[in-house]
Structure formats: C-alpha cells, structure tokens
Amino acid sequence: MTSEKPQNESFIQKIKSTSLVSQIIVAIILASLLAVISPESAKAFGMLGSLFVNALKAVAPILVLVLVTSAIANQKMDSSAELKPIVGLYFLGTLSAALVAVLLSFAFPTELTLDLAGATANPPQKLTEVLATLAFKVVENPVTAVASGNFIAVLAWGLGLGFSLKHASESSKGMVHDLSEAISSVVRIVIRFAPLGIFGLVANTIATTGFSALGEYSHLVAVLLSAMLIIALLVNPLIVFIITKKNPYPLVFTCLKESGITAFFTRSSAANIPVNMALCKKLDLHEDTYSVSIPLGATINMAGAAITITVLTLAAAYSLNIEVSFATAILLSVVASISACGASGVAGGSLLLIPLACSLFGINNDVAMQVVAIGFIIGVIQDSAETALNSSTDVVFSAAASHHITKE
C-alpha cells in the first residue's frame, strides 16, 4: 500500500511537469481515436468541453476588468521623448496587423461548425447602428456588465477606473496589481484544464460532424499564419525601410532568428524579455531606451494578438451569416488593436478578448466562447506563432526607432 502513494505522486508530478502544449496534442490525438472507435462514448465526453467553455465564460469578464484597470493604473511611462517614436511604432504595427487580418478574412472567409441551438445574434445593419449599440453598452452598470458578459462596458469601466487610479497612492495601485495577479492565477488554473476540455470538444465534434471540422481548423490556422507572415516579412520591413532608408531584411531576419525562434517555444513575451535585451545590446542600441522599450513592448506591442482577435471574430460572424461591412471591419481593427494591448502576460489572453470584439456584431457570449474554445484547440500553433511575431517585433521597432533618433 505504501508503495502506491509515491507512484501516484510521481504520476501527478510527471503530468504537471509536462508542457501544456504536449498535453493538448495528446488530448487531440486521443479524442480523435476515441471518436473513430466509439462515437457514442466520444459524445458523452462532450460534457468536459462544455464545462471548460463555461469556466472560460465565468472568468473572462472579471479578468478583462481587473487586467485593464491594473495595466493603466500601474503604467509607468518614461518621460523621455526617445520612447515616443517606439510607442508610436508599436501601435502602428498592431493596427496594421489587424487591418491585414481583416483583408485576409475578407479574401478567404472561414466558417466554423458551432452549436447554434438557442444562439442569438442581432447583427447591426449600418456603422451608425454599431456606434449606437456601443454607446448604450458603455453606460451599463458594471456589476450587470460583468454578470452578463457585456465586454464593451467592462472595458469602459476598466479604462475609467484605471485612469482614475493613476493618481492614487502606491499602496492602492499595489492592491489593484495584486488583485490582477490573483485573477490571472485563477485563469491559469482554468487553462491547466484545457487538455481535458479540448479532449471533450474534439471528441464530440469529430463524433458529430466527422473530420470536416478539423479541415475548418486547418483553414483557420492557414489564414492566421498567413497574416502573421505578411506582417513579419512585408509590413514590418516596409515600416523599417521608411524610417531608416536602408535594407530592412538583415535586421528583420536577425530578430526573427534570435528572438522569434526562442519566443515560439517559450510562448511568452515576458519570458523572452532577457533574450530581447541581450539582442538589443548585441545590436548596439541605447541601453537607456531599450531597457524601457522592450518590457513596454512585451506589454503593448501585440500584432499577433490583434490578428488572432480579428480573424476569429470575423470567423464567428461568417458562421452566423452576418454581413460585415468594410467600415465595421475597420472599427473592429481599432477595437482589436486596443484589446490586444491588454492580452500580455495572461494565459490565452488574446483568445479571452474575442467576446469583446464579437459584441460589436451582436454575437452572444455562448457563441463567442465556443470560438474561444476552438482557439485553444489551434493554440498549439497559433499561440507560438503569435508570441514569436510579438516578441521579435519589439526588437525590430526598437532598433528602427533608435536608428531614427541617432540620425536626428
């Protein structure tokens, strides 16, 4: 009897030490096999997927509220003018990424197989309707907004509280930061159950629809990766060339090789900060500048996240046969860019902000969270590529802006 306990503990420790990516890959393989061997059993495991989606729905609103409040309240922007062009490039890059994602989604629309039983969508017909809906959603009671998943109001209250708390005492700001960390830790616990949830979702999906759903996911991944490659290899080099008037590709390829590859496997912009710092030193950039711009970039430079939010939101709209005008898509790009800045440091952060963007099209929380769950299924590739783009771009823009400053 005594020998069983150490063996059980060893098994649990082994599971804990295995990366989440590996667990998700194993879950997808096992779910696919179960769906082929015993479709009825696979459908029964669909409950695990439903539990996971409901857990995401529970944590997402309070996460966005506290995260945005803390990020703004504790933001310490350096007064040095040298940072202004870098920050400007960060926002330009993020907005450009969202626009590229819109164009690719228009050219290659993705429709997903979703459970639409009881789902509602009240798509706006004109841009004026979108703006009117936004205005009314913004002024909702914060408690009601969190309870009902009104992410527009949640974001507005987060911004309002954050700017108000910028002038609060350091102890008050510290308390908000601690609360943000606590909520983030709860989210990490939920994400740890992602392999079980994804097992249930994949098993039920394949048992119900066959392997056609996985074909949809491959199309979705192709659109996401194409948008990220266009930003990394075309848009970012163009921005660097306009600033430096030099061939941008030696810098871009150096950053992709020395920062992007590491970030691809760590899947964390924050964890990649030391790598980026060392690369900036190797590139002989000003330490006073990059010591601030790199950590700042890990927080607000979120081109990959903007692409993920935009592509998956438009996929949800197409799945519900919602007509998306170009003007509304541009508004989505702006919302996705702003939302992406709050995705840093949170497990599945960009995915959990999708409901916020979906609310622009009147898509309810139930459908939005199904799209989030699909995001976790493809997250093995999506999150790695997203982080690689985000982190390598931090150095690309820091180097380009530093060159511009030196020239002046």
UniProtKB/Swiss-Prot annotation:
Name of the protein in its database record: Serine/threonine transporter SstT
Homology family: Belongs to the dicarboxylate/amino acid:cation symporter (DAACS) (TC 2.A.23) family.
UniProt cross-references to PANTHER family, sorted A to Z: PROTON/GLUTAMATE-ASPARTATE SYMPORTER, SERINE_THREONINE TRANSPORTER SSTT
TM stretches of this protein: 19-39, 48-68, 86-106, 143-163, 193-213, 223-243, 294-314, 322-342, 367-387
Molecular function (Gene Ontology), one example: neutral L-amino acid:sodium symporter activity
UniProt keywords, alphabetically: Amino-acid transport, Cell inner membrane, Cell membrane, Membrane, Symport, Transmembrane, Transmembrane helix, Transport
Protein localization: Cell inner membrane
Protein function: Involved in the import of serine and threonine into the cell, with the concomitant import of sodium (symport system).
Entry membrane topology: Multi-pass membrane protein
Reaction catalysed by this enzyme: L-serine(in) + Na(+)(in) = L-serine(out) + Na(+)(out); L-threonine(in) + Na(+)(in) = L-threonine(out) + Na(+)(out)
UniProt record, GO biological process: serine transport; threonine transport
Keyword ATP-binding among UniProt keywords: no
SUPFAM superfamilies linked: Proton glutamate symport protein (SSF118215)
Annotated source species: Colwellia psychrerythraea (strain 34H / ATCC BAA-681)
Principal localisation: membrane
Pfam family, one: SDF
Xref: InterPro entries: Na-dicarboxylate_symporter, Na:dicarbo_symporter_sf, Ser_Thr_transp_SstT
GO cellular component assignments: plasma membrane
